[in-house]
């Protein structure tokens, strides 16, 4: 019992215990306030246990320097007051940094549904816009006050502990007892850092790793088991390789066949193919105008035509009956900048930290927009096109583009994202009316209203906010009434855009392409097939409508990807083109049989990749390990059905890995001279 009277032992154990209690409390806050999981979720308690072991590891790492300073034989926290003040300063800084990471992590998860990782660094590139969006969306002052108060409270508690232990009279402890306590302490610290005590291989002890939290196969449950500070560190320390040329060569024959490469060359890794003017081009005296309308943060789960029961999108629903309506359209990766990239370049942005738009070496991409010869080209955005450096991609890739952004508009700015979508459409109409009638144009309109802070502008042409309850909207996928009304506003503005186009005289000879850039955070989507929520497909599954007065309405059930847009529209418009990117004209037969679309299901340093068809999803780790096949029509979609469908499993396994590795190469190979 004499050993338990040790001042240093009591201080070390007590300090680690206090910090561990803080981290455990923050984990409870995450589970209750942010995870969105009911407390009876399968595997939740086991995952919490993993998370608490990560918390103990972090607590030990934070306090280890002070424990060492207390344990030194002569100059230590007991004998040197200056050293004690230095230790207190360290505690203030360390706890403040940890607290800040947790705050950012909570916001990051609430916004994107992903724990903080190295990809968060991309927001630092647009710090001013990110800061303004946070300021307009969250109670920053209250959050800051709570953060500082929590840091002050825990530092005060640790200082009190210090006085209650280190300032006590020195007990008499024998040398052997002291040595035994020291040895036990070292072993305990090592076990805490290791994170496990069962099933240890003493010759090769494997520590608890972030991947252990994903044992359930459910990313939402796994998020409960991660420690944001440790996970951020894990993702930052891994080098970001650009591409694996060996893997590209290994899968080249299958991918060249998939793309329909005219002259396959495994040595040069040639992906180029050419398409002539097709007989199915739309008839007209001159080539049609093309209008791309990117629908900010709009997933299929929010659209009535895809099953949303609250009728939030009557205009898009009506258009769906008058257009090519795509039931299974996917963006390859979530994130607006990544969607802009793929929609222009035709190459999925599979970078693992920053967005491809932020790499100055690759922003000058080949794009099929340049195949629309004789067209005036416009890109219109209500805010600042410097956001995520997309202006570099637009200006360097699209020849002769006229880029209009926040500084060019006369309309008032409504929030951090610039002018309203309706004002963007109205001012854009004036620009498009000015194009000579005998000259076609290509216009890319990027909307932003369906985004936090979900501003409803005062000048909105009669839009009315719906009087619905939080329970109603949460039962249909929205997380708040504000989010639901933002979707309604976006749809209302699309209806106004079509009226504006008809009044402006540029509707009749135009192809309109409406597509979502990614889904936003959802609550629950019982109106969708279970696979979309349980397999994480709801993030990538977005609406797509292709509308033209001369285009016969059609429902397309096959899986189609974002990279397919430009080749498909070029075929409709009668444009011959040369393509070395990933997309394909969907009116051409798919060489692989049932169409396959490559996906990134979970971003970050260790992404999970997938290949999706109309009926199946194959998912695997980024290195090809742990492949599983899932039936999208099943009521239990997490079940691996690879044994029931061995041929499809084999086909998709090669295509999924090959398409992902080829896309990584194409980011660099598609650069223009």
Regions flagged by a language model, labelled:
Residues 39, 125-126, 227, 241-243, ...:
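Short coil/turn linker and secondary-structure boundary residues
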Residues 46-49, 69, 84-87, 131, ...:
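Generic detector of well-ordered alpha-helical segments enriched in charged/polar residues
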Residues 1-242:
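Transmembrane and membrane-interface helices of multi-pass
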Residues 81-82, 243-253, 356-360, 583-584:
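Short alpha-helical "patches" and their helix-cap loops
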Residues 262-673:
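Solvent-exposed soluble domains appended to multi-pass membrane proteins
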Residues 51, 55, 133, 156, ...:
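Residues that form generic nucleotide/phosphate-binding pockets
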Residues 218, 225, 233-276:
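The feature marks either
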């Amino acid at each position: 019992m004499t050993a338990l009277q040790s001042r240093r032992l009591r201080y070390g154990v007590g300090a680690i215990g206090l910090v561990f209690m803080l981290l455990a409390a923050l984990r409870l806050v995450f589970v209750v306030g942010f995870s969105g999981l009911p407390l009876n979720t399968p595997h939740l308690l086991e995952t919490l246990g993993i998370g608490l072991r990560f918390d103990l590891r972090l607590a030990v790492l934070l306090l280890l320097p002070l424990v060492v300073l207390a344990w030194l034989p002569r100059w230590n926290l007991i004998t040197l007051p200056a050293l004690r003040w230095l230790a207190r300063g360290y505690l203030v800084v360390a706890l403040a940094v940890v607290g800040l990471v947790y705050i950012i992590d909570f916001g990051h998860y609430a916004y994107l549904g992903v724990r903080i990782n190295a990809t968060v660094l991309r927001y630092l590139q647009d710090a001013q816009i990110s800061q303004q969006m946070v300021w307009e969306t969250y109670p920053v002052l209250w959050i800051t006050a709570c953060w500082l108060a929590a840091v002050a409270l825990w530092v005060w508690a640790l200082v009190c502990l210090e006085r209650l232990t280190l300032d006590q009279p020195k007990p008499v402890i024998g040398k052997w007892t002291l040595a035994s306590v020291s040895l036990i302490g070292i072993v305990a610290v090592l076990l805490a850092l290791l994170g496990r005590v069962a099933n240890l291989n003493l010759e090769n002890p494997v520590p608890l790793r972030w991947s252990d939290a994903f044992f359930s196969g459910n990313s939402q449950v796994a998020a409960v088991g991660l420690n944001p500070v440790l996970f951020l560190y894990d993702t930052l320390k891994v080098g970001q390789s650009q591409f694996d040329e060996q893997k590209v060569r290994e899968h080249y024959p299958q991918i060249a066949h998939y793309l329909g490469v005219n002259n396959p060359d495994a040595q040069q890794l040639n992906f180029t193919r050419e398409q002539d003017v097709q007989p199915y081009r739309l008839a007209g005296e001159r080539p049609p105008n093309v209008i791309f309308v990117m629908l900010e943060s709009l997933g299929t789960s929010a659209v009535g035509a895809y099953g949303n029961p609250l009728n939030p999108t009557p205009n898009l629903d009506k258009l769906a009956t008058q257009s090519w309506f795509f039931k299974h359209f996917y963006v390859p990766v979530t994130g607006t900048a990544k969607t802009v990239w793929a929609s222009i370049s035709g190459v999925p942005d599979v970078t693992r930290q920053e967005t491809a738009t932020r790499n100055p070496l690759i922003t000058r991409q080949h794009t099929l927009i340049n195949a629309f010869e004789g067209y005036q080209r416009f890109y219109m955005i209500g805010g600042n096109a410097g956001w995520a450096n997309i202006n570099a991609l637009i200006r360097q890739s699209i020849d002769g583009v006229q880029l209009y952004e926040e500084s060019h508009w006369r309309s008032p700015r409504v929030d951090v994202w610039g002018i309203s979508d309706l004002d963007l459409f109205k001012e854009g109409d004036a620009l498009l009316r000015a194009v000579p009638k005998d000259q076609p144009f290509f216009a890319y309109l990027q909307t932003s209203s369906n985004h936090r802070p979900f501003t409803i502008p005062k000048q909105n042409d009669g839009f009315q906010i719906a009087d619905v309850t939080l329970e109603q909207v949460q039962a249909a996928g929205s997380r708040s009434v504000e989010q639901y009304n933002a979707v309604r506003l976006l749809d209302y503005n699309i209806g106004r855009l079509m009226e504006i186009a008809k009044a402006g005289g540029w509707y009749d000879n135009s192809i309109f392409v409406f597509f979502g850039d990614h889904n936003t955070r959802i609550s629950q989507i019982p109106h969708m097939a279970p696979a979309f929520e349980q397999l994480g497909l709801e993030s990538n599954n977005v609406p797509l409508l292709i509308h033209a007065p001369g285009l016969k309405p059609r429902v397309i059930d096959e899986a189609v990807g974002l990279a397919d847009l430009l080749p498909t529209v070029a075929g409709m418009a009668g444009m011959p083109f040369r393509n070395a990117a990933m997309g394909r004209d969907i009116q051409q037969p798919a060489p692989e049989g049932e169409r396959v679309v490559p996906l990134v299901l979970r971003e970050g340093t260790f992404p999970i990749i997938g290949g999706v068809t109309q009926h199946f999803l194959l998912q695997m780790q980024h290195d090809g390990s742990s492949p599983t096949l899932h039936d999208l029509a099943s009521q239990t979609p997490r079940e691996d059905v690879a044994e029931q469908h061995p041929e499809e499993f084999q086909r998709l396994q090669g295509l999924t890995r090959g398409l992902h590795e080829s896309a990584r190469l194409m980011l660099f190979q598609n650069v223009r001279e």
